[in-house]
């Protein structure tokens, strides 16, 4: 039975930066207030680019770093909650076309919010272990600025745009060790984009009530996220007879520094183990984890064989954890 390995990672962010000081001119807030409560200092915002553009640029680099030819990629899966188009075509189809991948390639989207990248890993791993595919391109891409209400200070300060991509390939070394995913839709309305689907179709009333934007009950989500993320990590470590010290890098979803710190401290991860990018990117939903992996890869921390523990929680609710050995070449060797 073949095993699957993450053999390359890459990310892309748009050029424009929106700082906390910019928000001081837009809503009733301050840099001090935002940093203290979220850890976010800035975020990147796409002006002319759309989600598939962001995903294409990250994916192009991921393929290049993998050492594969584009013709060897046999599936493209994109996780996003801000697709180019509400219904169709999928963002993955557009990215595959933009990249000039094989005609007829398997391409589809998933929606798992901030847990999207871990769901992508599980799908890619399953396709490869089953023998159905050999090289799967996975992408978390978001233009969250298109679904953010910039008059709502409780949400607009949190989110940014960006994309992260990885190539998952059949390999006998540095394999994906384990992945756990889960969901609970009973509290879906605590983190939701209510409008423009079949529940509240696009209309003057939908737009008037700002139902086309992200709505979040922040305090409730915070409490559930900390408990759920901690439990998810404990379960996957226990299932694999591992301890926190067996992990080289803990890479949580970059939503809020208070959530990250609470989970890190509960699980006894050190500052050196924890990868943080929330200050410069904000919450980029499904792109958050691959962007964080890429940052630690490009600065030389993550190397071939590094053991990574990924952990995420998002709307749905969805959550999940993954343990894997990084299978790509060292950045210094590219």
From Swiss-Prot:
Residues 254-258 are annotated as: ACP-binding. Pathway: Lipid metabolism; fatty acid biosynthesis. The active site is at 114, 253, 283. GO terms for cellular component: cytoplasm. GO terms for biological process: fatty acid biosynthetic process; secondary metabolite biosynthetic process. The keyword Ubl conjugation does not apply. It catalyses: malonyl-[ACP] + acetyl-CoA + H(+) = 3-oxobutanoyl-[ACP] + CO2 + CoA. It is found in: Cytoplasm. Pfam families: ACP_syn_III, ACP_syn_III_C. Its EC number is 2.3.1.180. GO terms for molecular function: 3-oxoacyl-[acyl-carrier-protein] synthase activity; beta-ketoacyl-acyl-carrier-protein synthase III activity. HAMAP family: FabH. Belongs to the thiolase-like superfamily. FabH family. Homodimer. The last Arg residue of the ACP-binding site is essential for the weak association between ACP/AcpP and FabH. This is Beta-ketoacyl-[acyl-carrier-protein] synthase III. It comes from Campylobacter concisus (strain 13826).
């Amino acid at each position: 039975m073949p095993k699957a390995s993450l053999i390359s990672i890459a990310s892309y962010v748009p050029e424009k930066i929106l700082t906390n000081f910019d928000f001081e001119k837009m809503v009733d807030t301050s840099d001090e207030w935002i940093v203290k409560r979220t850890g976010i200092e800035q975020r990147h915002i796409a002006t002319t680019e759309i989600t598939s553009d962001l995903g294409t640029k990250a994916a192009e680099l991921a393929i290049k770093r993998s050492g594969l030819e584009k013709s060897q990629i046999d599936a493209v899966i994109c996780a996003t909650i801000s697709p180019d188009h509400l219904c169709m075509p999928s963002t993955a189809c557009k990215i595959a076309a933009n990249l000039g991948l094989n005609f007829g390639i398997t391409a589809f989207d998933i929606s798992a919010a901030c847990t999207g990248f871990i769901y992508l890993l599980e799908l890619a791993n399953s396709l490869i272990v089953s023998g159905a595919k050999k090289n799967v391109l996975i992408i978390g891409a978001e233009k969250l600025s298109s679904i953010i209400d910039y008059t709502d200070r409780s949400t607009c300060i949190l989110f940014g745009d960006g994309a992260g991509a990885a190539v998952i390939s059949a390999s006998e070394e540095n394999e994906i060790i384990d992945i756990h995913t889960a969901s609970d839709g009973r509290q879906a309305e605590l983190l939701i984009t209510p409008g423009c689907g079949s529940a509240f179709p696009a209309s003057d009333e939908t737009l008037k009530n700002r139902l086309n934007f992200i709505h979040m009950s922040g305090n409730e989500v915070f409490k559930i996220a900390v408990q759920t993320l901690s439990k998810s990590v404990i379960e996957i470590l226990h299932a694999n007879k591992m301890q926190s010290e067996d992990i080289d890098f803990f890479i949580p979803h970059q939503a809020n520094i208070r959530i990250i710190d609470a989970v890190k401290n509960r699980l006894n991860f050190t500052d050196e183990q924890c990868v943080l990018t929330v200050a410069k990117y904000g919450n980029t939903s499904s792109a958050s984890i691959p962007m964080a992996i890429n940052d630690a890869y490009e600065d030389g921390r993550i190397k071939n064989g590094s053991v990574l523990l990924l952990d995420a929680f998002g709307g749905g609710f969805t959550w999940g954890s993954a343990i894997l050995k990084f299978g790509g070449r060292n950045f210094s060797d590219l």
